[in-house]
Amino acid sequence: MEFYESTYFIILIPSVVITVIFLFFWLFMKETLYDEVLAKQKRDLKFPPTKSDKKKTEKKKNKKKEAQNGNIHESDSESTPRDFKLSDALGTDEEQVAPVPLSATEASAGIRERKKKEKKQKAAQDDHVTKESEGSKSSGKKVEPVPVTKQPTPPSEPAAAKKKPGQKKQKNDDQDTKTDSVASPAKKQEPVLLHQEVKQENVSGKKKVSAKKQKVLVDEPLIQPTTYIPLVDNSDAGALEKREVVEVAKQNMNEGIQKSGGKKMKNETDKENAEVKFKDFVMAMKNMIFTEDEARCVVEVLKEKSGAIHDVLQKASKAESAAAIHQLQDKEKLLAAVKEEAAVAKEQCKQLTQELVAEKERNGLLTAKMRERINALEKEHGTFQSKIHVSYQESQQMKIKFQQRCEQMEAEISHLKQENTILRDAVSTSTNQMESKQAAELNKLRQDCARLVNELGEKNSKLQQEELQKKNAEQAVAQLKVQQQEAERRWEEIQVYLRKRTAEHEAAQQDVQNKLVAKDNEIQSLHSKLTDMVVSKQQLEQRMLQLIESEQKRASKEDSMQLRVQELVEQNDALNAQLQKLHSQMAAQTSASVLAEELHKVIAEKDKQLKQMEDSLGNEHANLTSKEEELKVLQNMNLSLKSEIQKLQALTNEQAAAAHELERMQKSIHIKDDKIRTLEEQLREELAQTVNTKEEFKILKDQNKTLQAEVQKLQALLSEPVQPTFEANKDLLEEMERGMRERDDKIKTVEELLEAGLIQMANKEEELKVLRTENSSLRKELQSLQIQLSEQVSFQSLVDELQKVIHEKDGKIKSVEELLQAEILKVANKEKTVQALTQKIEALKEEVGNSQLEMEKQVSITSQVKELQTLLKGKENQVKTMEALLEEKEKEIVQKGERLKGQQDTVAQLTSKVQELEQQNLQQLQQVPAASQVQDLESRLRGEEEQISKLKAVLEEKEREIASQVKQLQTMQSENESFKVQIQELKQENCKQASLAVQSEELLQVVAGKEKEIASLQNELACQRNAFEQQRKKNNDLREKNWKAMEALASTEKLLQDKVNKTAKEKQQHVEAAEVETRELLQKLFPNVSLPANVSHSEWICGFEKMAKEYLRGASGSEDIKVMEQKLKEAEELHILLQLECEKYKSVLAETEGILQRLQRSVEEEESKWKIKVEESQKELKQMRSSVASLEHEVERLKEEIKEVETLKKEREHLESELEKAEIERSTYVSEVRELKDLLTELQKKLDDSYSEAVRQNEELNLLKMKLSETLSKLKVDQNERQKVAGDLPKAQESLASLEREIGKVVGDANVIENSDVRTESELTDKRLNVAVNLNQDVGHLKKLLVSVSQMLSKGREHYQLVE
């Protein structure tokens, strides 16, 4: 049984749970027993003996040895007490070495007191053990107190249990360092106890090993488990001694309980190993170092064992009493120190008791929880077992059904095998008969083929001659093509020449007429040449047509051959399809895997039969191929003859068609002559038109010349400097130019018409040439057709003779083809039977291969599971890499957030700079225009916008990367789903393999875990997307705020520009108004001074000053000066008003700066609020993730349960599908049986044919009978011919012997027929038996007749001798 089987796994889980529960109970029972023991110890406590300072070093050494030998096993502890009991009597030598300063009276009193205490404690513990054994079986083994040290397995030896409290006090000194180990005693004790239980079960199987281990364990000092120190008064000095006694009693009880099961098995081994144990004990006593208390305990044990040792000890005690008194005094000194240590230990014990109470409460809660969990697990276990039981019953039912179907299929297969054997026998007999017939037919075919081969040789020679003629014709065609190319070149040269002539035709009309005459002559010569060329072309075309027709005939013959080949291929395909059907049927018949071993044997026999059949078939195939080749030769001969006939028929048809074509050609010639006449008339008309156009062209040229002269005159007139005539002649010039343009247009149209007419002339000349050539070719064709008509008479006689020969050959070929088809059908039947056998063998081989493949699949499934595990590991690595990438992306996002913050800081700095610049602008409005500063601000803002666009691009790239990662996750999910499907398929295939089911479930769990990880990654991606969207929103808000700030800046800039423009315009207007006023005033003041208004104001003022000074020199007055002072005051007031307006504009700019600062502050406050909200949302997301994870765990648990149910359903469906397959196979077998029956009917038909042949042979025998009767009559009538008959007797005997052989053959065939028809109907068998009986009777009758004839002959001879 494997570990991962379901039944073993179900049993193991509850057993582990039960052991854990018993461990918890054991710990609690231990604590309760410890309290009871403490109460008993308080009653009987006494002061222990003192210790010496010299023995402390020895105790430390013993502690080290005990620490080395702390992990003693329970199986060894069971065997060690016997060793001590056997060797107690012999330990006096070691006892005398250690000094024992005690009197005999003290020793005896101590022994009595201890015996009484041990009896009381044993009685109390026996009662307690009986109670616990009734409550639970395991509590009796777990009565030990909770230890403080790290050694949880106490030894069960009585010698180690009787150690005195001197050693324990020394251990209590180190109790401060070991309080940490008290908190978890139960946890450290559980694995050791489990190990002890496993070892106790295997004690019976490991006796020899335990005996060897005991030798080693005796050499090492045993460790006494330390116990809790009770709360006792300082006056109770003997409490430690009583505690040891209680521990000894407990250990004895535990030993009694543990040894009750194994005493019987160990008595035999202890007797065998007694001597070895004694030696080991002596060696151990020599090596050990005892304290006084330990030595006293050993002596008491030895006293109990033997009385002789008591006398020896009394003598030794008298001698050493003085030394003991000194030691007692030293020990009393040590008691004071020990009491102080005991007080410290009491305080520690109080603390430990409080901790114990807290641990008890904790353990109570844990036990309650464990009980609830165990109850739930038991319920689930029960439901699971019920489900498994139901599924197991269903599977058993399905197996029973499957076995029944298998048995049915085996019975059917056996029946089919019997039928196959019968069919094989019938096939073998039929093949023998067919081979004999085929041999005779082949001889006939060979003779016919020899004749046909001779005829083929003659026709091949004729074909070679025809090919030579064709080659000559092809050479002539090539020459004609060359001539055509040369004619085309000449034609192109003529076209070029005509174009040149048309160009010269425009220059002079008289030369044109002469040239036209010359051209006509040339055209006639060319036309004659072209007609010659056309005639040669037509001849070549006729030859080409003949060649093409011959090639078409050949192509038709090849097509017919291809059609026949295709038909044969189709027949082969049909046969292959039938063979494939038979293959599938035979494979379905032999699908049972149970027959694999039997079929191997059958395959070997059938392989031998197949080899024989294949050899025979190979011979038949060779014969058939030779026959097919001969047939092909005959068919080629036929085709060649038919082609010749077709040629002759074609010639006759061509001759008939040529007569019709002659008539058509004559008609077409008349039509073309009419066309030529019409074209010549059109040419003449067009020539007249060209002459007229040329005359008009000359007239227009003359008019142009006159107009040009007039234009020159007008230009001369224009050159004259008379203005009134210029205006009058303008109209005339315009009219003249219009006329000139109209005439130029007319000239152009006339030229175009002339060119079109020349082109038409050239085209019509070409058409004339073509028509002339066609006429000449038609005339030549007429001549050739007349020649062919004269040759027709000679061809017709040849055609008739050839047709007769062809009809004869066709009859022969048809007979040969029929014979071949019959043979092909026979061979096809044989091939079918052979292929059926090969299919059976292949099916058997396939079944064996399938059985092997199934065995290999079972091995491959384990490898697939391993591969899936490796794939899952790879997927885990991919998931880890994805997580690392996500972490990197998160880091990048954080970095980008920091960059955004930095950019926001830069934006704040820029806004502050903008404010500073605005302030500077307000200060420098009078000096520098505001437009340049606004442009700087716009450039900076544009730079910031570019940075923001870059950030947008970076964010979009990151979003794309995240989208790609999401796609990768989706692909991972799809792969995981595919892995799920593969795992489910593996489950369905491995329903029978319980060992691999556990592994597949583990793989599903791993896949589910990976899906969880993927889901968590998707959630993280969604969170990151949300974070990205939030950051986008933030960025959008910041952009909107920046845009608002930009809009505010733009509005302020526009306002400032408008105001500056307004102020500038107003200033200019004011300045202009002031300048105008000043001029007017100055002119009013000095009316006699006048200056031009186009001069600038400054020049005007300078000039006016000069003029005014000159004027003032002449006339001076004080009143004018006063008026000027008043005007200056008014100008100063205007200047003050302008300054006030500038201050107002500055205040407006300051207000806009304040608005921008407020916007920045609001933006920063909103950013802080958003950050707080983001942190709160992240906390909420973490909480939601934790809750979602818990819900996902529950959902996955439910999914696993659902998957288990689905697996059971799938198993059921799989079994149902197997049943359906079995039913389908059964139906296929039935159909195959029907087909085999059809084959049997066909074979019966063939046998009937053979039976008809036998009847025919019987008729021949009857004819022979008639002949014999005629011979007898002749013998009776013609006695004179007896001498001749006597000479012909040996020949007649030979003929009779041959007849008897033939009759024997017929009888053998009849027997074969009877043997082959084992499975036929009863009527056929009766008929054939009657035929055989009749044949035998006829043969007997013939023999009697022969005997009578011989007797008559002998009598005739005797009579002849007597006559002589």
UniProtKB/Swiss-Prot annotation:
The keyword Lipoprotein applies. GO terms for cellular component: endoplasmic reticulum membrane. This is Kinectin. Both the membrane and cytoplasmic forms seem to be myristoylated. Residues 1-6 are cytoplasmic. Residues 46-207 are annotated as: Disordered. The keyword Protease does not apply. The gene is KTN1. GO terms for molecular function: kinesin binding. Residues 315-1085, 1116-1306 form a coiled coil. Its main location: endoplasmic reticulum. The chain crosses the membrane at residues 7-29. One of its GO terms (biological process) is protein transport. Glycans are attached at N202, N267, N623, N638, N704, N775, N976, N1061, N1088, N1094. It comes from Gallus gallus (Chicken). InterPro entries: Kinectin, Rib_rcpt_KP. Receptor for kinesin thus involved in kinesin-driven vesicle motility. Residues 46-56, 73-86, 121-135, 170-179 have a biased composition (Basic and acidic residues). A cytoplasmic form lacking the first 232 amino acids has been characterized. Pfam families: Rib_recp_KP_reg.
